[in-house]
Each structure stands twice: as C-alpha cells, then as structure tokens.
Swiss-Prot record:
Assembly description: Component of the large ribosomal subunit.
GO-annotated cellular components: cytoplasm; cytosolic large ribosomal subunit; cytosolic ribosome; glutamatergic synapse; nucleus; presynapse; ribonucleoprotein complex; ribosome
Subcellular location: Cytoplasm
Lineage: Eukaryota, Metazoa, Chordata, Craniata, Vertebrata
Name the UniProt record assigns to this protein: Large ribosomal subunit protein eL22
Amino acid sequence: MAPVKKLVAKGGKKKKQVLKFTLDCTHPVEDGIMDAANFEQFLQERIKVNGKAGNLGGGVVTIERSKSKITVTSEEPFSKRYLKYLTKKYLKKNNLRDWLRVVANSKESYELRYFQINQDEEEEEDED
C-alpha cells in the first residue's frame, strides 16, 4: 500500500468576505413620505458592530446613499435579516409601518413597497 500524502495549504490566508446589501426606497422617497438621508442617518446610529451601536466598527461596515438607494457593505459577517429588522424599526418610529412593507426582491436587496389594498373587496363589504 502506497503512503498517503496529506495536502497542507501553506499561508492559509482567507479572503475577506465582503457582504453588500441594498435597500431600495424609491417609491416612498418619490412620493415625499420618507427621507432617504434621514433613514441613512438612522442606520448609522443603530447598526451594531461587536455589540456597540454607532461606531460601525471603525470602517468594517459602510453605508452609502445614492438618491433613494442605500447600500450597506460589511467586511464582517452581517445579517440581511438584521437590516430588515432595523428598517421595520425605522418605519414604526416614523409612523410609516401601516403603509409600507419590506420585501426581498433579490438575494442581496430589500425594497420598500406599499401594501396592496383591494378597494373592490372593501366596497363589497360596505354594501352588506
């Protein structure tokens, strides 16, 4: 039986995993019910890195805004679900939670959409 050689990776440096999530606030910003700059400021104050809010880990997490899209980039593990949680918290704080919902439109992005209310169903209920 031939001796089995074990392959050992030399210089085992891991690649930095860069996570990039986008929040599309186009509809509410165009309608004027929400301010993207205010939302960006809220995220900067509230995102926790290593258990501390407000410091963004000294550049580990970056938040960028282009018109009505906000991009959150992280070099450390960062949950997309946490971003949804903070977005819902912002909507609740600004009394927008009744009109807007957070929907995942791709693997790395969320979109703020209005609730679809069928007016036909409401009219039928009123007639009864």
